[in-house]
């Protein structure tokens, strides 16, 4: 059995460790027991067994108080942890809200800056547009002036009948020259029928003439004449480029009759360059076809004293040529060129004119395309075919392949073949290898003294 003092010490110790709420309850209980105890002691004497029961009850109360205190402590810890988690969640939510607000603010600020920039650039754009419109108007004015000047240049300059040497399809001109004037001047002057050419295309070019391909140098001008002569069994090429000026010859009358005479002045000129590409070996056409000597001059000058005769025009090709052999069939274009030629048309049909030139005796050929179709591919070369009567070969012969230059083009052919009539045809070939239709066949009779 424990002594009462020891029990009291335990009770005091338990009181000290108890929370304040439980201590207050315990004090209330002690007061009630202290009040009841004197009453009982006054009336009767309490035995020891009753005291033991009282101490056991107090002990149980102390245990209950300890358990409740532990429960309260655990509840307080859980509550503190829960509040800490809530504070952390609140902090995270605040951060997210701040980020969203910042992004939205940045977006709105960028939109506002863009609107401000657009409003500020509007005036600048209007100023730039005004400058562009002014430049466009100036450019349009310049284009109009250039086009008008080109149209004026492209129009044929028709001169009066007393100052112009003009040969049409139905009329011919004879030019007479005295022996003295011919001897005193250059002997290399040759003439062709004068066809009006475009004065806007003035460009003299050097030409390279192999035995199978003839390349021309042409200057498109109303003053230009292109001469080519062909002779004997070797394809001999001599090209002379000249640049001179045509001077008008007034007080000369011109009639439409073939016997009318036109006097033109002597030609005093220095050749800029002469290219002689004569090959000593025989050409491809030395056996089966008539062979020629080709000469080309980009310009010829006519003055008021020397007379160059031109014979009458050849047949315009309206007659019947049923007795002639068929023209050669052109080869088909290469299959790999099919994709490139989809949007283009084959070459157009040229128009050919044939005339006799009296000094030196040669045949002048000129060809042109009156209306050029822009959808056609550029022409690479022109092929010249010849057929002459009293020949052993009953087929057309290609006598020259001429590099394409600005139209119209011209050439002269001089030959010594015994034939009563000559027939000519021209065919064009484009850069893709396609051949166009042949021109209308032109014929011209053998040269005779009656033409003079």
Swiss-Prot record:
Can you say where in the cell this protein is located? Nucleus
Source domain of life? Eukaryota
Q: Which UniProt keywords apply?
A: Activator, Nucleus, Phosphoprotein, Repeat, Repressor, Transcription, Transcription regulation
Residue stretches making up the Fibronectin type-III domain: 346-450
Positions of the UniProt region annotated as Disordered: 185-206
Q: Which GO terms describe its cellular component?
A: nucleus
User: Could you tell me which InterPro entries the record lists for this protein?
Assistant: ATF7-int, ATF7IP_BD, Fn3_ATF7IP, FN3_dom, FN3_sf, Ig-like_fold
Q: Give the Phosphoserine positions (modified residues).
A: 184, 257
Quaternary structure note = Interacts with MBD1, SETDB1 and SP1. Probably forms a complex with SETDB1 and MBD1.
Q: Which family does it belong to?
A: Belongs to the MCAF family.
UniProt protein name: Activating transcription factor 7-interacting protein 2
Give the originating organism.
Mus musculus (Mouse)
Cite the source lineage. Eukaryota, Metazoa, Chordata, Craniata, Vertebrata
State the encoding gene: Atf7ip2
């Amino acid at each position: 059995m424990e002594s009462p003092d020891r029990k009291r010490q335990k009770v005091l110790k338990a009181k000290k460790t108890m929370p304040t709420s439980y201590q207050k309850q315990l004090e209330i209980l002690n007061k009630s027991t202290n009040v009841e105890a004197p009453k009982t002691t006054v009336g009767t004497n309490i035995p020891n067994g009753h005291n033991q029961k009282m101490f056991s009850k107090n002990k149980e109360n102390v245990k209950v108080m300890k358990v409740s205190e532990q429960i309260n402590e655990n509840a307080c810890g859980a509550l503190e942890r829960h509040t800490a988690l809530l504070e952390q969640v609140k902090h995270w939510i605040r951060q997210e809200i701040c980020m969203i607000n910042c992004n939205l603010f940045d977006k709105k600020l960028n939109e506002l800056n863009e609107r401000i920039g657009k409003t500020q650039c509007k005036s600048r754009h209007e100023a730039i547009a005004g400058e562009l419109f002014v430049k466009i108007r100036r450019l349009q004015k310049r284009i109009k002036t250039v086009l008008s000047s080109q149209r004026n240049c492209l129009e044929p300059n028709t001169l009066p009948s007393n100052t112009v040497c003009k040969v049409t399809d139905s009329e011919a001109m004879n030019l007479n020259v005295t022996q003295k004037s011919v001897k005193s001047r250059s002997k290399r002057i040759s003439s062709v029928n004068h066809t009006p050419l475009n004065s806007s295309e003035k460009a003299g070019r050097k030409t390279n003439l192999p035995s199978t391909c003839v390349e021309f140098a042409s200057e498109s001008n109303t003053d230009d004449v292109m001469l080519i002569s062909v002779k004997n069994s070797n394809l001999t090429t001599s090209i002379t480029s000249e640049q001179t000026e045509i001077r008008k010859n007034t007080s000369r009358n011109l009639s439409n009759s073939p016997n009318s005479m036109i006097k033109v002045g002597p030609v005093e000129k220095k050749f800029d360059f002469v290219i002689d590409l004569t090959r000593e070996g025989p050409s491809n056409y030395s056996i089966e076809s008539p062979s020629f000597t080709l000469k080309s001059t980009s310009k010829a000058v006519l003055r008021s004293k020397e007379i160059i005769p031109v014979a009458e025009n050849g047949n315009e090709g309206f007659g019947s040529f049923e007795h002639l052999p068929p023209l050669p069939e052109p080869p088909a274009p290469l299959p790999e060129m099919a994709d490139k030629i989809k949007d283009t048309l084959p070459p157009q049909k040229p128009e050919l004119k044939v005339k006799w030139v009296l000094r030196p005796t040669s045949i002048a050929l000129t060809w042109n395309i009156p209306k050029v179709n822009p959808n056609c591919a550029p022409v690479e070369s022109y092929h010249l075919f010849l057929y002459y009567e009293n020949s052993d070969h009953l087929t057309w012969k290609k006598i020259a392949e001429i590099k394409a230059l600005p139209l119209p083009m011209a050439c002269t052919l001089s030959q010594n073949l015994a034939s009563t009539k000559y027939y000519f045809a021209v065919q064009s070939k484009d850069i893709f290898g396609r051949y166009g239709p042949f021109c209308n066949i032109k014929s011209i009779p053998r040269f005779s003294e009656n033409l003079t």
